[in-house]
Regions:
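Glycine-anchored helix-breaking recognition loops at helix->coil/strand junctions
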Residues: 1-14, 42-51
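Non-catalytic DNA-recognition/assembly elements of restriction-modification systems
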Residues: 19-139
Length: 139
């Protein structure tokens, strides 16, 4: 008992949940599907050299950046940390593939040294030390 936090309705009313357009909701839903697949105990490893939980941690990093952009869009654009502009075309290019292939290709895309999302994630501490770096360190 007492494992899960309990909230009262009045506490949830002040919780800052963003209302986002349907087209953006789909992106978050896709990433959630990827994570649920990767964390299934009975799913095969997508890559022979990398455990699914390792892939999931990178997908969580991308998803975190997307969430930050929901709440700090202007700031992220000002300091060149916005990522949705890069994630959107990749997701669109993967949409007709099986989920395993989507995850594999997203991971391989993200692992490239020139990947803008990956580079921006690594720049959080220097470009946004007082906002995003503080949040990111607590995740």
């Amino acid at each position: 008992r007492g494992i899960f936090p309990q909230f009262k309705i009045n506490e949830l009313e002040i919780f800052p949940i963003k209302n986002i357009a349907q087209k953006n909701q789909i992106k978050f839903s896709i990433f959630s599907d990827f994570l649920m697949y990767l964390y299934q105990q009975n799913s095969n490893n997508i890559l022979s050299h990398t455990d699914n939980t390792r892939i999931a941690s990178h997908i969580e990093d991308i998803l975190n950046m997307m969430v930050y952009e929901l709440y700090f869009e202007e700031h992220m654009k000002e300091v060149d940390l916005d990522v949705l502009q890069f994630v959107t075309p990749v997701l669109e290019s993967l949409q007709n593939l099986p989920i395993e292939q989507q995850i594999k290709e997203l991971y391989e895309w993200y692992q490239k040294p020139e990947n803008a999302v990956r580079q921006r994630l690594m720049l959080i501490d220097t470009r946004s030390p007082d906002i995003l770096a503080v949040i990111h360190k607590s995740v």
